A protein has these predicted regions:
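Hydrophobic transmembrane alpha-helices that form the core helical bundles
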Residues: 58-134, 139-142, 156, 278-298, ...
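Membrane-interface loop-to-helix entry segments
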Residues: 125-173, 184-185, 225-229, 338, ...
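TM-loop-TM module centered on a large, flexible mid-protein loop between adjacent transmembrane helices
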Residues: 77-81, 85, 117, 121, ...
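Generic alpha-helical transmembrane segments of integral inner-membrane proteins
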Residues: 50, 54-58, 98, 131-139, ...
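Transmembrane helix-loop boundary segments of multi-pass membrane transporters
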Residues: 35-41, 112-126, 146-155, 272-279, ...
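Transmembrane helix-boundary motif of multi-pass solute transporters/channels
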Residues: 5, 9-109, 198, 206-207, ...
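Helix-loop-helix junctions that connect adjacent transmembrane segments
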Residues: 3-7, 46, 50, 124, ...
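A generic transmembrane alpha-helix motif of multi-pass inner-membrane proteins
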Residues: 341, 354-443
Length: 443
């Protein structure tokens, strides 16, 4: 078998890179979160979406600068290690891996909910369908089948099409009365909706592997990120507004897209939504597990892929059985299930933003500081789930044994004098270790 790990990938145009970036940002969580936010905050959930879009813009700006400075050899763990040290980088890697593992059952539950809606069945059917989807994905993963980027882009295009059809087709049924009361549970409900919604914005770190495929990263990358931000912002806001304005009292359900499509095109709406949700769930979960397997192998010091696959599958199976079983028994809610991977990803982003404060300079450093503070507040607002994330980070950080020969440079950035500017500027901290090079997009 030929080793193609070091083969040079084809160069990307700005449009092609933007398409891949949008594919990394959009996922099955878009099918659930508008309804979840509306349930917690009512029409005021739109304000939460707006606020988090501003935050995601700051995060995108920071990752753009990190991507152009640190290059494709680094990922979220590499950025954290470069600014905060190798132990922090190791903790970030494990938090990200744990986020993918705990996010897998949530993604499958999204697909299961749309199947249950199609069948007109209750919540238990959704959990059974989620387990069936998960078993299928794990079997495929053990078989070694990967989800190609081409298929991912096709499925994302299908998702975008469904959202556009749903929003545009259902728009005539919007009612002003559905916007009152604007905040039925007060600002407490708005605050509760904020942390889970961050799951929709996981993916900005995917800028790392794209930089190596751009002809001129410093010129192209800002355009790529700007395009991706504009497209995703329109989709998120459009779906959030339509969910509230059209569905009204039914906005808080687990399948908002099915409800909008039913209004837009009639009885075939839930069928299209279910088919799209199941296909996206299977492909996205397989892609997440593929990336998680690679990261697990790297964290294990380069252990065999087969061993890493078996370990990842076992971890996902055990975690999913625990979480879905607890949800099916009524011990936890869907919102609480979403809170676990969200808290883990928030911890990763907190580390990246804190590292960026040390590594970068100028306005981007200020953006990183603001983003770091807001992410910290969101993490604190996630409640008990933050304790789960903190435990993972603490154990990973204290048990890590950094290799002295690793290429991670954990020092603060060196400074180089710029005669034209009359000041010193940070120097690229250099590439990170291979462990940090793994990049996995979240749900």
């Amino acid at each position: 078998m030929t080793d193609t790990r070091h083969a040079s990938p084809p160069r990307l145009s700005t449009a092609g890179a933007a398409a891949l970036y949008i594919g990394a940002l959009l996922g099955p969580s878009l099918l659930l979160l508008p309804g979840l936010a509306a349930r917690e905050a009512g029409p005021a959930s739109v304000l939460v979406w707006l606020g988090l879009l501003v935050l995601s813009g700051l995060i995108a700006l920071v990752f753009t600068r990190l991507g152009t400075r640190a290059g494709s050899a680094t990922g979220v763990a590499g950025y954290t290690a470069a600014g905060l040290g190798p132990r922090a980088g190791q903790a970030a890697a494990w938090c990200f891996l744990a986020g993918v593992v705990t996010g897998a059952p949530v993604v499958c539950l999204i697909g299961g909910a749309y199947v249950a809606e199609l069948l007109g069945a209750g919540g238990r059917t959704a959990y059974v369908a989620a387990l069936c989807l998960l078993v299928l994905v794990l079997a495929v993963r053990l078989g070694g089948l990967r989800t190609g980027s081409g298929l991912q882009l096709v499925l994302v295009a299908v998702l975008v099409t469904l959202v556009v059809v749903a929003v545009a087709g259902a728009a005539p049924e919007a009612r002003a009365a559905h916007w009152t009361p604007f905040a039925p549970d007060g600002w407490g409900g708005v605050a509760r909706a904020a942390s889970p919604l961050m799951l929709a914005f996981v993916g900005w770190e995917a800028v790392a592997p794209l930089t190596a495929r751009l002809r001129d990263p410093r010129r192209q990358l800002p355009r790529v990120v700007g395009t991706a931000f504009a497209v995703t912002a329109l989709l998120y806001l459009g779906l959030a507004v339509a969910t509230v304005a059209v569905l009204g009292p039914r906005a808080g359900g687990p399948v908002p897209l099915a409800g909008l499509l039913r209004v837009a095109i009639g009885g075939y709406g839930p069928l299209l939504a279910a088919v799209g949700a199941v296909a996206l769930t299977l492909a996205a979960t397989n892609a997440y597990l593929t990336g998680a397997t690679s990261m697990a192998a790297a964290l294990a010091g380069g252990a065999g892929t087969r061993r890493g696959t078996a370990g990842t599958v076992a971890a996902v199976a055990a975690t999913s059985a625990l979480l879905l079983g607890a949800a099916g028994a009524g011990l936890v809610t869907t919102a609480q299930l979403v809170a676990v991977p969200t808290a883990l990803f928030l911890l990763v982003y907190l580390g990246c933003m804190a590292a960026a404060v040390r590594l970068l300079a100028g306005p981007v450093r200020l953006a990183a500081g603001v983003a770091c503070a807001v992410v910290g507040l969101l993490l604190a607002g996630s409640g008990w789930a933050a304790l789960v994330g903190a435990a993972v980070a603490l154990v990973a950080g204290t048990r890590a044994r950094p290799d002295p020969s690793a290429r991670v440079r954990s020092r603060a950035p060196e400074r180089r004098h710029n005669p034209e500017a009359g000041r010193s500027e940070p120097v690229d901290p250099g590439p990170a270790s291979d462990v940090c090079g793994q990049s996995v997009t979240g749900p």
